[in-house]
Amino acid sequence: MRKGWIIMKAVLQVVSHASVRVDGELTGQIGPGLLVFLGVAEEDEQADLDKIVKKVTELRIFKDDAGKTNLSLQDVNGELLVVSQFTLLADCKKGRRPSFVKAGNPQKAEEMYEEFIRVCKEKVPKVEHGVFGADMKVELLNDGPFTIVLDSKEL
C-alpha cells in the first residue's frame, strides 16, 4: 500500500443523458448510462486504472425488469461519458483552502485519463469524453439519483 496517498478516484452517476462542452463546443454527449468524473493521483498505476474500469463497466447499478439494481453498464448497453476532475483529490485537512498536491502531475494524469478512455472503449460500445485540463461545462439528468464513489485503494 502506498502510505498516506489518495489513489485514483471516480464518481459514477447514473444518468438519463449527459453532455460536456468546452468553450461552447460540444465535446461529448450520451444517452442513458454513466457519467464518470475521474481523478488521477500522483502514485496511480495501471492496476489502479484496471480496478476502476472493471467496476465502472461491471458494477450492477442499473435496474432490471423487476426494478432491482441487478444489471451492469455492459448488460444494459449503456453509454459512458468520462470527465477528468483533479479536484476529487482535494485534501481539506488543513485550513480553508483545499490542497491538490496529491493529484497526479498533468502529463501523467492525462496519460492515465487517455488510457482509461481507451480501455473503457474495449468494453463499452459508446464512450464519450471531455477535454483533459479544460474548463468544462457538464450537463446531466441524474436517474435516481444514483451516485457511487470509487477509490482504487478500497477495491
Regions flagged by a language model, labelled:
Residues 100-155:
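Positively charged, low-complexity, intrinsically disordered RNA-binding extensions
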Residues 70-87, 133-143:
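A short beta-strand-loop-alpha-helix capping motif that often carries His-Thr
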Residues 1-7:
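Short, Lys/Arg-enriched N-terminal segments with co-localized hydrophobic residues
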Residues 13, 39, 84, 139, ...:
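Short beta-strand segments
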Residues 26-77, 88-118, 128:
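Compact, glycine-rich, soluble single-domain proteins
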Residues 14-21, 28, 40:
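N-terminal intrinsically disordered, cationic/polar leader segments
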